[in-house]
Amino acid sequence: MFSITVAEASAKLGVSPARVRQLIRSGVLAAEQVAGIWLIDEKSVEARREHNPGRGRPSARLSQPNISRYLLMNRDHEVLAFRFDASTGEFLDADEIIDAKRAPLSIMSPRGTKASKTALSYWWCHRAIPKARHGIEAKLVELGVADTYDLPFKSMGLSLSDQYWIKPYGSEIRWSDVNYFENDFSEAPVEEWMADVGLDSPDNTSDGVLSKRWVCRNGERCLLKGGTLLDQEPYNEVIATELFSRLLSDGDYVPYTLIEWGGAPVSSCPNFVGPTEEFIPAYYVNEVLPQVPHRDSYRHYAECCVALGVEDIETALGKMILCDDIMANTDRHWRNFGLIRDVETLEYRAAPLFDTGSSLWCRVPTRELAYTPFVVNMRPFYEDADRQLRLIGDTSWLDLDKLAGFPEWASDFLDENPSMYDRTDFIYEGLQKRIDFLHLLFG
């Protein structure tokens, strides 16, 4: 976010204001002048402070053969040009801004004249498979690839979560020829999670720790997602779908089904991003406006959404908060909710609810369930579940009577998983208690 003044940057870096201005002129610090005042990208200041280079002649890296120049594209729109060091995974610059309004949210300065290479690097890092995902280290060795940041380059950075991609500077490749929304992608004939990683596949740009794989079924792009030790997460996704179907409208949530794949139960859901749309995690939406001191995170996020023209955002957040409370979802972090933007019209709307698998006490060992409270620490706004529930204003959509029989349905469904032995009674009671409390709170 471009919000640091020269004086503040001077204090953070331990250098003079004159040196800060020199770093701005040289492009080391991304900054933009507004009303005669330099506003500096906070991430570039932090990166400079961590790097803290010594004195000496500037590096000749830009002339090295491992440095390549690319265009960041959004469908057929050229967004910006950048240089990338394949040996380190570092964005060296973003020196040519072409279409700032279609850039990834949060990397541009307020006037759209500068891009933060630090923010761009952070965005790209979360476009790659995290190193914590099971099997990725062995896959990197198999492919002879040094790090996960290299994987998206093997498929031009293409994704099924947005419309961004990269192409060599001066190339005449067209979006219609390469995108995964319209074109086939690699699908290995084996039911293994890492089979398509490193190939021409959207699996190269799938974020998140749990195993996942994109497949095409009867022309529909679907995401398969596994579970952990007890395989409870895929079942939880289907239970959440049942809950949503009782309380919400069809467009408010992503429907999940349970299938057998690779010898285990996995969840399957259709892609919720359309062929002209991108999903923007709340993390980036949160940086649209500067954080006002003492403003709570809920209010700040809602104000950022309003600034982008999103209608009824507090109603959408209320639906998320209430459903997460019923599901005891402890993993509603700032990357699995957010907004959908149409990259042609630049209109925003709330993203549908998805990724509710880490719920229903699935991370509590069976032997500890008897000593576990039904009320859990919630996210993303408050840990206190009751305090977070009190953020809900509009309840015109809510009919709790539609939840009659839901705890029984959920426990019966979980009984189909042999690993749920000695767990379903606790989950049934927990669901019923949460629903009973909501009746007391909302009537």
Regions from the PLM with identified roles:
Residues 57-322, 326-328, 339-443:
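Phosphate/dinucleotide-binding and metal-coordinating scaffold of catalytic cores
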Residues 14-39:
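Major-groove DNA-recognition helix of helix-turn-helix-type DNA-binding domains
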Residues 333, 338:
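Canonical protein kinase catalytic loop motif
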Residues 1-17:
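Polyanion-binding surface elements
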Residues 42-66:
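A short, Lys/Arg-enriched interface patch at domain edges and termini
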